[in-house]
């Protein structure tokens, strides 16, 4: 297995050349990092010349809590999982949005049509804008939803809650009414164990 991964790594490195920032084999998978400016060209090369004809997943990542010196890249990344059926191989592709405040990356819908809803989900959950996407709108949250819930700075309790009001006969929005509570851990001493 390692020899086939090494061969795939060498092939991808020669195919992508300067478009490739890094390629690592970890836990039995090859992960490559490309720049956002060259991701469309890189993905077309991977599809047309390396046989990665299917994008089986696309997701967003928020690395804002990795600011401890170990992670010196931008905050938001997009991760693709590609599959080559003819070669029986998988590949993880990662690229970072250059701007942390307003993450914009190119859409890959022209390369793989299957990324349509994946890109909409990453936009809805993380606020990553896919430039060139024909229908980039929310897919999981409500139309009037404020913010992006998978961002690390989004409050756990949210901004508003919805509930059904029987007097009005409809669903209403109201500010979150969660009271903070103090949780005290319970200590069980050894002498109190049964037995």
Curated annotation (Swiss-Prot):
Enzyme nomenclature, EC number: 7.1.1.-
Catalytic activity: a quinone + NADH + 5 H(+)(in) = a quinol + NAD(+) + 4 H(+)(out)
UniProt KW keywords: Cell inner membrane, Cell membrane, Membrane, NAD, Quinone, Translocase, Transport, Ubiquinone
InterPro entries named among the record's database cross-references: NADH_DH_suC, NADH_quin_OxRdtase_su_C/D-like, NADH_UbQ_OxRdtase_30kDa_su, NADH_UbQ_OxRdtase_CS
Family: Belongs to the complex I 30 kDa subunit family.
Subunit structure: NDH-1 is composed of 14 different subunits. Subunits NuoB, C, D, E, F, and G constitute the peripheral sector of the complex.
Name of this protein: NADH-quinone oxidoreductase subunit C
GO molecular function, one term: NADH:ubiquinone reductase (non-electrogenic) activity
Primary location class: membrane
Recorded topology in the membrane: Peripheral membrane protein
Pfam family, one: Complex1_30kDa
Organism per entry: Laribacter hongkongensis (strain HLHK9)
Subcellular location: Cell inner membrane
Highest taxon, organism lineage: Bacteria
Record's function text: NDH-1 shuttles electrons from NADH, via FMN and iron-sulfur (Fe-S) centers, to quinones in the respiratory chain. The immediate electron acceptor for the enzyme in this species is believed to be ubiquinone. Couples the redox reaction to proton translocation (for every two electrons transferred, four hydrogen ions are translocated across the cytoplasmic membrane), and thus conserves the redox energy in a proton gradient.
Stored NCBIfam families: NuoC_fam, PRK06074.1-1
High-level lineage: Bacteria, Pseudomonadati, Pseudomonadota, Betaproteobacteria, Neisseriales
GO cellular component terms listed in the entry, alphabetical order: plasma membrane
